[in-house]
Amino acid sequence: FFELDGKHVLLTSPQDMLPEGLEYHTGNGTLCIIGEMDKDTYTLKEQFNQSVDYGIDFYAMQTVEAPDGRRIMIGWMQNWDTLAHRCNDSKWFAQMSLPRELSVKNGRLYQTPIKELDALRKNRVEYNDVVIENDTITLDRVEGRTIDMELVIRPEDKENVYKKFALRFAQNEKFHTELSFRPYESVLKIDRKFSGTERALVHQRRCLVNGDANELKLRVILDRFSAEVFINHG
């Protein structure tokens, strides 16, 4: 619980949740309540609520206030339902998320990678005005298992919007993970069913995207064992 940008914010990680549209999913989840604190009764008057993270594995987030006043959050990229699937010969299991800077805008909790990560960027590759026409393309030098990538996707003709955009990563001849967006539905989906797991785990998760459906902005940070996606600046 903390104060941020003129609002009071409560973060919690409920268990055994019931689904509610695309905002909340079954099982272990995350919840952010934004409102005003009544200092006389010590109660939080709720104004908005949302999931903290819309991915498949994110739980038990914690925050700290940095010396410069930033509110920084980190989360556990795992959940209680999959703890039994640890391989006996593995030296470690699960991991923590990247640190994220939090802010509150228009009743929503925004999250962006901390600015310190920018110092780790190198070997810059940039493409502009790439046109995709009913086909799959690969871009030279956009490769590897550790990437910090920013994309802006928009239709050439706003009156004739594309049906689906998909980005595949961690891909070889047999495996891949896919991130896709359908502008007519404003829905972004992560699909890891072809990532190589042999377990009957949750493989897909969808979320609604706020903002202009004619322009989608993504920042995808790909690690060897994870992918974190930030939509429309957080």
Enumerate the language-model features and the residues they cover.
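Beta-rich accessory regions
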Residues: 3, 31, 36-57, 62-234
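Hydrophobic core segments of beta-strands in well-ordered, beta-rich domains
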Residues: 7-20, 71-77, 81
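Structural motif
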Residues: 18-34
